[in-house]
């Protein structure tokens, strides 16, 4: 069968659609945000493909796998087992790294266990057990006629006179020994000092190097090794020539350091055999940070330099008073004026020094006690360790920072694993390389003999996987990069690379916008990867808005014509030419140029006196970057993937502004030197793609604040007043008006062992969340449940006479969310939708004209038409005097910006510099900027 037949698909907003999709092709599903693309791709095709595959397994196997809900569709045939590669499921496990997710690290562990060379951490010499034959051969390689002696170390750096030892050696017939570097006669040994460390090596043989010495040397080595426990030394009889140390043990010949046999688990930081004992393989240690604990060093302790230890907290302040009396310092002097030693005592304690503390209880009784002062940092640490209260822990977490582990230096591995080498390179050094550099390392790695044979297959797997990561545009990442720091797009492309590595055939892959976070330059490589996946014999279904991806597809499906209830139909399908020729296709109109996002005729001019200057940003790969952001403009931060955009804006600029403008205490900016110009703003708002809530109780109505005035409206009706209902009656989060059978959830979870957990509508409220009495109250003929089921568009019309609600609903429509329901669970919103709900909430607030807005790729999940709407909103914010800073790859957004700051020139270590800045017209002329190359044609 060469096609997938879909008949009568009605999942979510799909309107009974019929489709014939070619198999083993690259198919792009496009359309407006909310038109039903994901409903078709993920909730219908993927869900049914996955469900049928899992259903074919035994009942025992099914209990370990989650079974997808059966989609609302009459008939689908021609499906393959389905694999979905989404953006959502980035691991939050601190033990997951790029290396472990892609399995490259597993192959590296195997490689180091099989061909690695262990060395002594102190002497850097290889640990290798040598046979007597190897030792003899090594000696015979020395210049012919060289006068040498064979020594057996008996005493190594030990105190004592060692009279008995020397007598025993003489009794065994040995004539000479080397004591502390001097050769002497055992018939008349020197007297050794009792309290000094001595080294005694007995001379087993003296000889001139000749080819016929094999037998004699073998016997001498045997004697020496037996005497010393496996160590022998060859030293020149005259002069200070180089000595050769031999070991018959798997140990360092100098200090005896030995290691267990190399196994892959020794190199795993998730296994006790390989993890650093101090940080348990996490690579970082948590500690109470003095910089966070000291709230304001300009204040005195009495005024609250350290929160919780001021005059308001009587118990702790009593302790500080006694401490001040003992060390003679002033509690009313600014903390930063106290001597370093006093500050140290306050923070870290008095050590063993006992202090007399005066404690006064509520009745005024005085009690004197002598004990050392624990120190504020140690007190916080003890409280954090001992408490069982979550609220106390949450409060104390504010004062905790992380630093690289002092034992392993952040490598996560124990000492033994850190000292195994392949051609002078350790495993921690490999994983710190960028993927591109690691690929170069293995491509040029030369091993010899048996080691080359052993490593051949493993290195092929490593090279293939690294090449796949480069092909999806991730050449700038390190293998040691923690998975929780990856963006959604990066995580998705890593999973894509892993799938290519698996080399499956006959599978249906469903991808959700793989081009997110990818610069135009890297897009071509991604598309080649997708076509490669298709050419292996797979059906590749991609939900995508990127123009290049749509043009590259074998078959395009355009869902529309609008969003939500106005969508759910197949507007156009077929080849690229058929889409362009279809007058009903909004996508086709934008691709053909009939519709387009217009380049502004003039840019808002920059006021050179109103800028924010960030000096010396050096986090991650940034190279002492000086950032200048114009105030009151719409600025775009551009650059290839991994060039340092997120580090500069999210990790440095936003966190500094968040701390200084919003008073945040937990934001830890990346390293920088100074910042000036933040006085132009009254607050900073970061509108990111994190969920608006992590439970189904969170929804757009509660998040944007619309639900409160709606509840007040219901409580103001005649029926409510006569019953005495207050606004709280209409909340599904508190007792009173909600259905207690399901506690306001509307559904009840039923655990099924062989099947997925089933959520059934509550029997009592029938999924309406409220009890019968609450639902009897109507506003304009609608109950509270019916209002929550309305789309934003319907609600806007319904609440038009209520300005406070209508205004907030209008902002949701302005950002293209007319189709979402007011009570839609936050967990069902995509990252792009969550970001736009946040944007709508900010738009609905009273505007001061002095706000700094920071957005990271707001075009995620947006069609050309949606981008037009978003730009209208962002330009409106700018026109009110606010400053908008957007990290973006989308050229339609970049070309409408007032100012561009382009980072590069490459990703990873090849980036981290500002290579161009100015208006789009200025930047387009810059040589060496990848952004300029793609932007130039857009401005014509």
Curated annotation (Swiss-Prot):
GO cellular component: cytoplasm; excinuclease repair complex
Pfam families in the cross-refs: ABC_tran, UvrA_DNA-bind, UvrA_inter
C4-type zinc finger span: 252-279, 739-765
SUPFAM superfamilies xrefs: P-loop containing nucleoside triphosphate hydrolases
Subcellular location: Cytoplasm
InterPro entries: ABC_transporter-like_ATP-bd, ABC_transporter-like_CS, ATP_grasp_subdomain_1, P-loop_NTPase, UvrA, UvrA_DNA-bd, UvrA_inter
Listed GO biological process terms: nucleotide-excision repair; SOS response
Coiled-coil residue spans: none
Record carries keyword Kinase: no
PANTHER family: UVRABC SYSTEM PROTEIN A (PTHR43152:SF3)
Subunit architecture: Forms a heterotetramer with UvrB during the search for lesions.
HAMAP family the record matches: UvrA
Protein function: The UvrABC repair system catalyzes the recognition and processing of DNA lesions. UvrA is an ATPase and a DNA-binding protein. A damage recognition complex composed of 2 UvrA and 2 UvrB subunits scans DNA for abnormalities. When the presence of a lesion has been verified by UvrB, the UvrA molecules dissociate.
Protein name: UvrABC system protein A
UniProt source species: Vibrio vulnificus (strain YJ016)
Gene: uvrA
């Amino acid at each position: 069968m060469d096609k997938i037949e879909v008949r009568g698909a009605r999942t979510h907003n799909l309107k009974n659609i019929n489709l014939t999709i070619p198999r083993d092709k690259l198919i792009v599903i496009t359309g407006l945000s909310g038109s039903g693309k994901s409903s078709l791709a993920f909730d219908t095709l993927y869900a049914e493909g996955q469900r049928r595959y899992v259903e074919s397994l035994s009942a025992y196997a099914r209990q370990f796998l989650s079974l997808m809900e059966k989609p609302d569709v009459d008939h689908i045939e021609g499906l393959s087992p389905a694999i979905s590669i989404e953006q959502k499921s980035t691991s939050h496990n601190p033990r997951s790294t790029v290396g472990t997710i892609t399995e490259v690290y597993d192959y590296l562990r195997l490689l180091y266990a099989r061909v690695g060379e262990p060395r002594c951490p102190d002497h850097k010499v290889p640990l290798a057990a040598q046979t007597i034959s190897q030792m003899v051969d090594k000696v015979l390689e020395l210049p012919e006629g060289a006068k040498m002696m064979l020594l057996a170390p008996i005493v190594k750096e030990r105190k004592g006179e060692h009279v008995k030892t020397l007598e025993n050696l003489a009794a065994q017939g040995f004539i000479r020994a080397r004591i502390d570097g001097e050769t002497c006669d055992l018939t008349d040994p020197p007297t050794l000092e009792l309290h000094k460390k001595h080294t005694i090596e007995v001379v087993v043989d003296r000889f001139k190097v000749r080819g016929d010495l094999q037998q004699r040397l073998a016997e001498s080595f045997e004697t020496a090794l037996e005497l010393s426990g496996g160590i022998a030394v060859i030293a020149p009889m005259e002069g200070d020539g180089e000595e050769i140390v031999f070991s018959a043990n798997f140990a360092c010949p100098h200090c005896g350091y030995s290691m267990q046999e190399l196994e892959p688990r020794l190199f795993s930081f998730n296994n006790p055999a390989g993890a650093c004992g101090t940080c348990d393989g996490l690579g970082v240690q948590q500690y109470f940070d003095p910089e966070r604990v000291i709230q304001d060093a300009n204040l005195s302790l009495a005024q609250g330099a350290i929160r919780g230890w001021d005059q308001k907290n009587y118990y702790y302040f009593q302790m500080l008073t006694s401490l001040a009396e003992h060390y003679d310092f002033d509690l009313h002097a600014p903390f930063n004026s106290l001597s370093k030693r006093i500050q140290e005592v306050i923070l870290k304690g008095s050590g063993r020094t006992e202090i007399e503390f005066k404690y006064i209880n509520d009745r005024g009784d005085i009690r004197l006690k002598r004990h050392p002062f624990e120190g504020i940092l140690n007190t916080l640490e003890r409280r954090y360790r001992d408490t069982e209260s979550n609220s106390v822990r949450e409060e104390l977490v504010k004062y905790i920072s992380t630093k690289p582990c002092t034992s392993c230096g952040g490598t996560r591995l124990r000492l033994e694993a850190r000292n195994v080498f392949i051609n002078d390179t350790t495993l921690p050094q490999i994983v710190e390389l960028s993927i591109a550099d690691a690929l170069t390392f293995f491509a040029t790695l030369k091993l010899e003999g048996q080691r080359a044979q052993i490593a051949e297959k493993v290195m092929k797997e490593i090279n293939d996987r690294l090449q796949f990561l480069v092909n999806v545009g991730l050449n700038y990442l390190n293998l040691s990069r923690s998975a929780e720091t990856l963006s959604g797009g990066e995580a998705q492309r890593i999973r894509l690379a892993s799938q290519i590595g698996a080399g499956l055939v006959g599978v249906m892959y469903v991808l959700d916008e793989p081009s997110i976070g990818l610069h135009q330059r890297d897009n071509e490589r991604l598309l080649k990867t997708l076509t490669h996946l298709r050419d292996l014999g797979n059906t590749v279904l991609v939900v995508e808005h990127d123009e290049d991806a749509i043009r590259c597809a074998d078959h395009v499906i355009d869902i529309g014509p609008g969003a939500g209830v106005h969508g759910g139909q197949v507007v156009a399908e077929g080849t690229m030419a058929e889409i362009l020729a279809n007058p009903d296709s909004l996508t086709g109109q934008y691709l053909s140029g009939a519709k387009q996002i217009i380049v502004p005729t003039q840019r808002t001019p920059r006021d050179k006196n109103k800028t924010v200057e960030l000096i010396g940003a050096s986090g991650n790969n940034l190279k002492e970057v000086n950032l200048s952001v114009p105030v009151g403009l719409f600025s775009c931060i551009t650059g290839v993937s991994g060039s340092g955009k997120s580090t500069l804006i999210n990790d440095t600029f936003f966190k500094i502004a968040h701390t200084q403008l919003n008073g945040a205490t937990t934001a830890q900016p990346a390293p920088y030197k100074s910042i000036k110009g933040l006085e132009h703003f009254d607050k900073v708002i970061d509108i990111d793609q994190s969920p608006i809530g992590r439970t189904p109780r969170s929804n757009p109505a509660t998040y944007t604040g619309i639900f409160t005035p709606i509840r007040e409206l219901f409580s103001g009706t005649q029926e409510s007043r006569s019953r005495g209902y207050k606004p709280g009656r209409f909340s599904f989060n508190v007792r009173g008006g909600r259905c207690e059978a399901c506690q306001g959830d509307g559904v009840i979870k039923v655990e099924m062992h062989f099947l997925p957990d089933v959520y059934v509508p509550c029997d009592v409220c029938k999924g309406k969340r409220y009890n019968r009495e609450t639902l009897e109250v109507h506003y304009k003929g609608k109950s509270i449940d019916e209002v929550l089921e309305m789309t934003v568009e319907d609600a806007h019309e319904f609440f038009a006479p209520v300005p406070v609600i209508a205004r907030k609903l209008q902002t949701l429509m302005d950002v293209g969310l007319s189709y979402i329901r007011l009570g839609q669970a936050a967990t069902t919103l995509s990252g792009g939708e969550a970001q736009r709900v946040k944007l709508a909430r900010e738009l609905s607030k009273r505007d001061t004209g002095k706000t700094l807005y920071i957005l990271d790729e707001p075009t995620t999940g947006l069609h050309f038409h949606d981008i037009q709407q978003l730009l209208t909103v962002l330009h409106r914010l700018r026109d009110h005097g606010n400053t908008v800073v957007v990290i973006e790859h989308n050229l339609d957004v970049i070309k409408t910006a007032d100012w561009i700051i382009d980072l590069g020139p490459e990703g990873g270590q090849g980036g981290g510099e500002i290579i161009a800045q100015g208006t789009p017209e200025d930047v387009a002329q810059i040589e060496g900027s990848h952004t300029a190359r793609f932007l130039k044609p857009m401005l014509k």
